[in-house]
Amino acid sequence: MNTCILKNIKYLLVFSFFLLMASCSSDDNIEKKESPTEAIDLARNFLTGDIVLSTHATLNGVNKTLLPTGCPTRFNFTWSTTEKQAFTIKLEDFTIGEMPFSITYVCDAKCMPLNSWEKKEYKGDGWLKFNGTNGYIVLEKDGKPSIMNGSFVKGYYNVNTHEINFIVDYNMMNVRSECFLQTIDKSRTSKFDAEFKKYEADLAAYKKEHGL
């Protein structure tokens, strides 16, 4: 291999390194950027109030909802009146498996653009990312709220198609709620009680069939 080729390879490697570093630096700063105003306006108009989504509740990585279709779960989205890019997500009276108590979890989240890696997974226009950390938990209905350091919400929402998926990690007993990718159907809110009863019936049939 002649000297000229070696020199070109060296320059190519150096250039690739700095290009990678620049990309990483840009992605690291993405959380400081705001999503486009038009996209936020669309999100605030649709992703608001009570919304029923299908979730898998996991304990130590094991899906306790058992059914592939997940469990109907009611979330509340309330947008900030002082910060346009921010909202509060609330999950009330959540329980899983044989837990002897219910959990209410509340977390403030902020919208931001996707980084370069996320754009490869969530293709197309209209995607927003939202992150929130250190929410607070209330055990039982009359319990006092306590900050749960290390807990977080991380997810993605498309303002055009209304697709959404996110994870709620409570940082407690390795419990997570995983909202897998799905399209929001607002009509589910009024049918929540009936849908939940059907889930319980299907779950009982599943347990009987599998000897659980």
Summary of predicted features, one role per range:
Residues N2-L13:
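Bacterial N-terminal signal peptides that target proteins for export
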Residues K90-E92, N131, I167:
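Beta-strand residues in well-ordered beta-sheet regions across diverse protein folds
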Residues L20-S23:
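C-terminal motif of bacterial Sec signal peptides marking the signal peptidase cleavage site
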Residues I9, G143, H162, H210-G211:
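Short, flexible coil/linker elements and helix-boundary hinge sites characteristic
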